């Protein structure tokens, strides 16, 4: 089907949400069996500092541990509020931040980051002014340290829905911020896949939650393809993506094309699709790409394609550049778990 479709369903009792654009899988949300998932807000207890790593460990509920980088003014035993920012690798602590974000469908409340802001994606000045006035009224009486961001989906939403949403998320933020003292505790759980789809994927041309929706829209077939390392590209080229404990290895092959431009064409196709593949597979950390052979003078073309592709991706990424052996190195934040076994 053409257009933007959100598909909701279950696989072996696990919630699944898929975002399709013109039939192609663009984003995915799956049940995660981890103790805590990115976005969860907790009360923790400051543990020992680790000078060599530039941070402190934080005791979390259920005997779990988190790691907070560059803390300021914290003492061991102190209770603090933290938010999970990524996935904990096996045997490692959860990455944490003290910069909390309270997200809802229309608004984001930002403690200690004051100001009322409207998404830059909304360009109509009259709409921006109306939304600013609405936000100002909804935040009347709030602590001056609370900021607010109105999300792009507000452009087409009814004012009363936006106002109710702001008041609800503001109330949640105010209640949590008062609940600092005490033992480690989960205060706000991250949304499940279906709720996350409603909150973060905006409006769609269709939302299908019928029993056969995953099969009907081809989601199951596309998930099966993700369970293997090979990604088929245009012109018979391919990209192999394999995760090791240290990094994600990506190998790009030209296939049957033997023309002089084959290497560059295959590498450009791989660069364009790489952010989507990493996102759907739940892969992050260091990524090392062995592009198909092409002249050094064409490397700047690949860099431009990579930068454009990752700018459009929601995950944070940094481009380290070319290694002495001619591979390209980048890093992507681990913002979700790798595909679980029940997906295949």
List PLM regions with ranges:
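Extended, charged alpha/beta regions that create polyanion-binding interfaces
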Residues: 1-35, 40, 89, 97-143, ...
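S1/OB-fold single-stranded RNA-binding interface
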Residues: 4-21, 27-31, 35-87, 93
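Structured core elements
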Residues: 7, 16-19, 43-45, 57-59, ...
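Short, well-ordered alpha-helical scaffold segments within catalytic/effector domains
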Residues: 43, 132, 220, 268-275
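Conserved glycine-centered short motifs in functionally critical loops
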Residues: 54-58, 88-90, 94-109, 169, ...
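A short, flexible beta-alpha/helix-coil linker loop
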Residues: 64-65, 114-116, 155-156, 254-257, ...
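Short loop/turn segments at strand-loop or loop-helix junctions that form parts
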Residues: 74-78, 111, 151-154, 250-254, ...
């Amino acid at each position: 089907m053409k257009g933007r479709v959100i598909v909701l369903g279950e696989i072996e009792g696990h919630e699944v949400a898929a975002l399709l654009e013109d039939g192609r899988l663009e984003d995915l949300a799956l049940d995660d069996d981890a103790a805590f998932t990115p976005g969860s807000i907790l009360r923790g207890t400051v543990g020992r500092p680790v000078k060599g790593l530039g941070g402190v460990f934080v005791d979390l509920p259920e005997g779990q541990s988190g790691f907070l980088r560059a803390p300021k003014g914290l003492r061991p035993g102190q209770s603090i509020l933290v938010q999970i920012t990524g996935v904990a690798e096996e045997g490692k602590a959860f990455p944490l931040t003290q910069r909390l974000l309270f997200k809802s469908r229309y608004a984001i409340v930002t403690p200690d980051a004051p100001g009322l802001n409207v998404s830059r994606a909304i360009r109509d000045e009259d709409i921006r002014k109306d939304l600013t006035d609405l936000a100002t009224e909804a935040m009347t009486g709030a602590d001056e340290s609370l900021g607010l961001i109105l999300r792009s989906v507000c452009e087409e939403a009814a004012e009363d829905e936006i106002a109710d949403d702001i008041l609800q998320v503001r109330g949640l933020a105010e209640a949590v911020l008062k609940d600092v003292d005490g033992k480690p505790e989960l205060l706000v759980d991250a949304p499940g896949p279906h709720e996350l789809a409603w909150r973060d994927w905006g409006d769609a041309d269709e939302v299908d939650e019928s029993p056969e929706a995953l099969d009907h829209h081809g989601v199951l077939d596309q998930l099966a393809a993700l369970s293997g390392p090979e990604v088929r590209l245009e012109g018979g080229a391919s990209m192999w993506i394999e995760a090791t404990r240290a990094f994600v290895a990506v190998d790009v092959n030209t296939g049957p094309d033997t023309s002089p431009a084959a290497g560059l064409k295959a590498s450009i196709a791989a660069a364009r699709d790489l952010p989507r593949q990493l996102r759907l597979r739940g892969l992050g950390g260091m990524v090392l790409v062995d592009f198909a052979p092409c002249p050094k003078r064409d490397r700047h073309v690949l860099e431009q394609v990579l930068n454009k592709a990752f700018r459009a991706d929601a995950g944070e990424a940094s481009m380290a550049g070319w290694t002495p052996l001619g591979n390209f190195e980048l890093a992507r934040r681990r913002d979700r778990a790798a595909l679980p076994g029940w997906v295949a």
